[in-house]
Amino acid sequence: MGILGLLWLPGNPGPGANGDQYRLEQLQKKIRTVSGKLMDTQEISYIYGGSLPGGVGRLCEECTSCLKLKKPKPKKRMQSCPDCRFCGLDCSHFTKLVFEKAGLFAPYLTTHQMLNLKPKLLFQNYQLLPVRHLDLARSGDLLVYKGHVVLLEKKTSGNKGDIIHATGGKAVKGPGQGIQRETNVNLNQFRGPLRRILRHRRLFIAADLKPAMNDRKSRED
């Protein structure tokens, strides 16, 4: 039985080994730090299909000025303001960038792939695995909706939590501010129904495997 058979059924985190839990918490903290820094220190506009973060520079200034002047819809921004291809991100490129800067293996995949790839391919090619229930989600997980993905910063209460994402929606305060944090949102219905929860392999700990192993053992007995 391979690692996929163990990890696809994550259970409630137990106490686990202290070192394992510490490693998890440090990695979660790094992911939050990276995403927060991108939001606070770089001028990133939401650009559909955009894959490059913003920053201080002529092209970024021209992108921002163009967006303010023309006010194109999110999916028309790169077409209306060509300089924005150098200074914008969409939601899936944002989560890829955060994982990369946090030191995680993170090939790009679209939200369509996140929703439709089978667990085996997700694990083999992207080191991601589905988490079956929202009550098992935790900081660092990807919450995938139809056409959108967000990074979970923390659960608050019930089905609510804090998320950070690249967005061209109503939460955006203006050009250059496409990365937004939203607090205490309904995670089950943030952008329509929650379709899938994905967790990077390195965010699993040994305690997550125990319920899966026990369940398999009971079936074999």
Question: Can you describe what each PLM-predicted range is?
Answer:
Residues 30, 104-180:
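...with weaker cross-activation on analogous glycine-rich loops/strands in unrelated enzymes
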Residues 6-108, 146, 213-221:
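N-terminal capping segments
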Residues 50, 119, 183:
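Solvent-exposed, flexible loop/coil residues
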Residues 178-221:
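Low-complexity, Gly/Ser/Thr/Pro-rich intrinsically disordered linker/tail segments
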Residues 1-5:
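Hydrophobic membrane-insertion alpha-helices, especially the h-region
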